[in-house]
Design a protein with these regions (language model features):
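Short beta-strand "acidic-cap" motif of Rossmann-like dinucleotide-binding folds
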Residues: 32-34, 150
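Glycine-/Pro-rich loop/turn segments that contact NAD(P) or position catalytic residues
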Residues: 81-166
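NAD(P)H-binding glycine-rich loop region in Rossmannoid oxidoreductase-like domains
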Residues: 2, 7-8, 34, 39-95
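Active-site-lining helix/loop region of Rossmann-like oxidoreductase modules
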Residues: 10-15, 130, 139, 157-159, ...
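N-terminal Rossmann NAD(P)H-binding glycine-rich loop of SDR-like oxidoreductase domains
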Residues: 5-27
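A generic structural motif
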Residues: 28-32, 196
Length: 216
């Protein structure tokens, strides 16, 4: 690695976050702060490079404390209060002066998924999920942070890294993508901090077009 950064991972117990953590430890020299609601659920894999911090992402003060000295924030968050979490993250980052944010969202927040798959996606995700993730994304996009929104297709646990991307305003491609692929994309964004700055990026596995993911 040509540089070493201090990374704060929010929602560090998530599946994608754990995969990204593993890749960051194996392939980079970055220092990691793992932030999650219950610290007992996660053990540090490398005490020299990792610190586990317990906190709630809606608690701006605990976020501000965790953000001290951080270069890049990677947020792997979920829940019905995702919009409130987004507001808290933006506020804390602005207060401390941290600019770079990688935020995992979901496909469909702009109604960008075409055809029968788009209809199926609405049927599966409308009624609270898409709406809250769209609202959270709007909070991030309306901030002056140096953000990248990542919009994964339906997630699989396949042991492959294979993905392509689409930009906001383009029709979403494919139906699915592996968590391992999203983790790999996140690590690339961390290693190239200027990449996809203030962009919202759809991520899918190539050649997975269809009416729904293969595992449905």
């Amino acid at each position: 690695m040509l540089f070493m950064a201090k990374i704060l991972i929010l929602g560090a117990n998530g599946k994608i976050a754990k995969l990204a953590e593993k890749e960051l430890l194996e392939k980079t020299t970055h220092q990691l702060t793992l932030f999650l609601r219950n610290a007992d659920r996660l053990k540090s894999s490398d005490d020299k490079r990792e610190m586990v911090v317990e906190g709630d992402t809606t608690d701006t003060k605990s976020l501000e404390k965790a953000l001290k000295g951080i270069d890049i924030v990677y947020a792997n968050l979920a829940g019905k209060n995702i919009e409130q979490q987004a507001k808290s993250v933006v506020t804390a980052m602005n207060t401390v002066g941290v600019k770079r944010l990688i935020w995992i969202s979901t496909l469909g927040i702009y109604d960008e998924v075409p055809g029968n798959f788009g209809k199926w996606n609405h049927q599966m995700l409308d009624g609270g999920y898409l709406e809250t993730y769209a609202a959270a994304a709007k909070v991030i996009e309306n901030s002056d942070l140096d953000y990248t929104l990542v919009r994964p297709a339906w997630l699989s646990n396949k042991d492959i890294v294979s993905y392509e991307t689409t930009e906001k305003g383009e029709p979403f491609k494919g139906t699915e993508v592996s968590r391992k692929s999203i983790a790999d994309f996140v690590v690339h964004l961390i290693n190239e901090p200027d990449k996809e700055s203030r962009h919202s990026v759809g991520v899918n596995q190539p050649n997975t077009d269809g009416d729904k993911p293969s595992f449905y």
